[in-house]
Amino acid sequence: MNPFVDGAFEAKFLTGDTYSSQPASAGFFSRMLPSLSFYSRLFLGPVRWLCSRASKGQCDDAAWVYASAWVADLVERMGCPIQIEGMDAIEAVDGPCLFVANHMSTLETFMLPAMIRPRRQVTFVVKKSLTTMPLFGPVMCSRDPIVVGRTNPREDLTAVLNGGLERLKKGISIIVFPQHTRSREFNPQQFNSIGVKLAKKAGVPIVPLALKTDAWGQGKKIKELGPVKPGLTIRYTFASPLTIAGQGKEEQAAICQHIESHLGKWQQQDGINE
């Protein structure tokens, strides 16, 4: 029995190559006080549940996927439709791979496990502060992530290469956000090639991922707790796997092109002021 398809939450994104939310509208409380409504449900629901399991050493992969899909369900109930394309690419390679994506908000860290883990083992490259935060820290540590400090690029590269090779050899795929910080805008010059370097060294393919998750905004004092914006569409598009050839410059350019082109298309579809 597959532990990830026993219930509606676990199987939420096991819908083939694409997923599209059913039309929904936010309730009165969510429309009037969207951020308060969302965060109260988030922390009293999946976060509390998953943290409780983590404190007991029970934050396993099935729990991770369940909580991830639960968060996605909460977002939809806020009136934010989810559109996902290209999920066949997650299973298009034999063995582990890298998922290299732009980084826009906290939401992708919550949602990606529900898309990827039912199809293959996966963990993240994360900044150290996420592993020491109250509530989130024990959960993130239970996922055996690759931890970087984001203060010394040379040390971060060593950590990613060494930690990445170790996990890839175990068959664990890795999600990498090469941007220095979360941003609604995408600047290729600030999108480093650490994912390409690791893929080349390990001899594994890269699955590029473009995402738009600004429905969960960035906070001014606490970045993870920004304004929630009902009505904004949440979008993810996976591209076909890339095999690194030579120094990887062409593949790095292809990843950036995938992200830039989709962000531009989504802006036109959704409206510049969305």
Region locations from a protein language model:
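Catalytic core of membrane glycerolipid acyltransferases/transacylases, capturing the structured
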Residues: 38, 48-53, 93-152
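Short gly/ser/thr-rich secondary-structure transition/capping motifs
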Residues: 78-85, 157-158, 218-221
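Short acidic-hydrophobic, aromatic-tinged amphipathic segments that line or gate anion-handling sites
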Residues: 84, 146-149, 244
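Residue-level preference for the first positions of well-ordered beta-strands
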Residues: 96-98, 171-177
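Hydrophobic/aromatic ligand-binding patch that stacks against planar heteroaromatic rings
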Residues: 115, 139, 166, 197-198
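A cross-family acyltransferase "interaction/gating" segment
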Residues: 137, 173, 184-250
